[in-house]
C-alpha cells in the first residue's frame, strides 16, 4: 500500500529542508458526515479551490475532498482513511496547467505508517486518483515508517529515518533517506514514480 505522513518545507535545496508539522486543527465547520471536524483546510491553485475535511475519532477518520471552480461541478470524494489527516498540499507537478491535491494521513501506532490520498484535476471538471508507487528494493531497506512529505518545486519529496538491525523505534541510526517522486501518466491513471534517492 502507498504510505505517507507528515510534511516538511523546502529551503534552498532538498538537503536544506526544514522539518515542520503542518497539522491544522479547527473547530467544527460542517460537512457531509456528522461529528467534529478533526482537520479542515482550504487551498486554491489555478482557479480550483479544494476543501479538505476529516472527522471521527479512533484509528479511522472520514475524509471529504470537495473542489470548486473550473468547468465543474466536481463530484466530492468521500472515503475512510486509516489514521488522521495531518497535512494538505496543492501543486501542479506535471505542469499541465491543472492542479493536484495531496492529503497526508498519519497512521496510529508507534511506526506512524500512513497513506497518501491524492487527486488530479482532469479537463477542469473531474478529479482522478493518483497512486504512489510502493517502496521496494534498496529504497525500502531500513524503512519503518515515520515519513515526512512536502512539495519541492516539481517533485513530491519523501523523507524518512533509516533503521539498522537492533535499532529501537525511538532511535534510528542509519541516517535519513529522501526520495523525489515525479507525477507520470500510467496505464490506469496518474502515478507518482521515484526519480532520485538521497541518503544522508
PLM features per residue range, with description:
Residues 62-72, 113-133, 182-186:
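Beta-propeller blade repeat segments, especially FG-GAP/WD-type strand-to-loop junctions
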Residues 51-83, 129-139:
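Blade-edge motifs of beta-propeller repeat domains
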Residues 54-56, 104-107:
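Beta-strand C-termini and the immediately following turn/loop, strongest in propeller blades
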Residues 101-105, 156-158:
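Hydrophobic beta-strand segments that make up the repeating blades of beta-propeller
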Residues 89-93:
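Calcium-binding motifs, dominated by EF-hand helix-loop-helix domains
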